Amino acid sequence: MKHVIHVDNSEFFRKLMKSFLSEKGMECESFEKGEDAVNAVSGGRASFVITGLSLADMGGEEFLKRLMTLPQKTPVIVVTSSDEIKKLKRLEALGVKGIILKSGDWKTELGKILRV
């Protein structure tokens, strides 16, 4: 079973994501704070990390940079409402596996990336 770490400042979106992933047979741990998610990922159980760019305690780019310093290289997918091209290019440069806009059909796009 895939274990997904999801971090986003929106409680509504965390619940929505957890429900979606559960329906797909995945275990999901949700966090509001990036620091808590980094600690969970460092435990080594995560198959994927799904993150927004607005977190309760840090920005999404800072969170991604922190993840990249961990010894395990867990794939990261960004699900965001931001469509700023410069910001999205910076995320690609940080090595994210995929960027999905919340305004689009994010469930279908996420399913393709996760292969579910």
Annotate each language-model stretch with its function.
Residues 56:
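The feature encodes the CheY-like receiver
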Residues 62, 82-100, 104-108:
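Alpha4 helix (beta4-alpha4-beta5 surface) of REC/receiver domains from two-component response regulators
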Residues 61-72:
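Short amphipathic alpha-helix used as the core "switch/output" element in two-component signaling
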Residues 52:
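Active-site residues of response regulator receiver
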Residues 11-29:
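Two-component/phosphorelay signaling modules centered on CheY-like receiver
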Residues 30-48:
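Acidic, metal-coordinating helix/loop segments flanking the phosphotransfer/catalytic sites
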Residues 33, 59-62:
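Acidic catalytic/metal-coordinating carboxylates
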